[in-house]
Amino acid sequence: MKNLERPLHKAISFLEERGFRYAVIGGVALSQWGVVRATFDVDLKVLVPDTDYTALRLALRTAFRDRARPHVPENPLIVAVSIDDVVVDFLLAVPGYEELIIERAVRRELNGWSAWVCSAEDLIIQKVVAGRGKDWLDVEALLLEQGDQLDQAYIQDWLGQFAEALEQPELLTRYQDAVAKSNAG
């Protein structure tokens, strides 16, 4: 996290000085819940005031002019910039569940300053839905680290909704298997 701290602080300072609500997600958030793994970028979920995506994209691109990954086609929900040679992804929240991620974020201390960090439950939900191999390793590590502190009813309710909406019932069953495995170990 050492190399990420300065760009993370710059990004968060920008958001907080302008009153934008956000939550740190991804690998940096994992470290705040006791799971340490290599991460090379910063991911921030940002609430879009009055759903004015254009204004927020413009504000971010004006403040942080160095575009990250210029070879990748732009996604209207992601503003990817480079701050001090670190990729910072501002992921613009869509109404609904993603707003809850920000509402449920908790203030955590980060080496003398603080930031809003995604809850462990919402981090698990995002990782299960993403479904990559490394995401499942993160889910298993979070289950071991956070255990009984997790609100399983909340997690399983949202995973059930995503499983149905995405027509992927295995999301919920695979997660339930991971919970059973962590409880047995």
PLM feature segments, named:
Residues 1-185:
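Compositionally biased terminal segments of proteins
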